[in-house]
């Protein structure tokens, strides 16, 4: 029995990835149109609130798996798996929580055009490409950031070499 990653061939790892892809299918790229929406997250406090609210929504949607995401000042991107109705439900909950948060803080934010679109991801290669696309968004828009440093998404977990030193955990195990 092979016990270390070095002993597993590339072909075996690819077969394992393909098996996991099929097991968790369907996958989705959820996004909102940044060309239509007004600014939502105007400062670090807004982004922190958005990150926390998105985390709460993910925890309240156990039937949806979130693989990566990025919050931008007027839109978001997420890669998820689960039934499309559950994925849309997670987004709708996030949008409602944002509305309530801003109403409590007295800030007027127009979320009329903050609507989600779904793109089905039908292959493992497409999933990989979409994950890279989502994680690149932050530092493409903000040249002062790198894949390691954009704070409002999961990109740092993908690109940070230090993340390999941390044990793999899920939110449920924390």
Regions found by a protein language model. Name each.
Residues 1-73, 81-174:
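Short Pro-Cys-Gly-centered "Cys-loop" motif that presents a nucleophilic cysteine in a tight turn
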């Amino acid at each position: 029995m092979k016990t270390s990653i070095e002993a597993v061939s590339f072909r075996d790892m690819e077969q394992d990835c393909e098996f996991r892809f099929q097991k968790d299918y369907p996958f989705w790229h959820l996004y909102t149109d940044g060309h239509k929406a007004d600014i939502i997250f105007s400062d670090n406090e807004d982004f922190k609130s958005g990150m926390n609210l998105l985390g709460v929504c993910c925890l309240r949607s156990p039937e949806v798996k979130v693989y990566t995401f990025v919050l931008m000042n007027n839109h978001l991107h997420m890669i998820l798996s689960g039934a499309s109705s559950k994925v849309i439900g997670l987004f709708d909950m996030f949008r409602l929580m944002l509305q309530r948060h801003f109403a409590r803080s007295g800030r007027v934010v127009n979320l009329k055009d903050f609507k989600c679109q779904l793109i089905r991801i039908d292959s493992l290669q497409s999933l990989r490409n979409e994950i890279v696309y989502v994680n690149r968004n932050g530092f493409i828009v903000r040249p002062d950031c790198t894949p390691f440093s954009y704070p409002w998404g999961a990109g740092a977990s993908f690109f940070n070499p230090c993340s390999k030193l941390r044990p793999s955990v899920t939110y449920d195990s924390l």
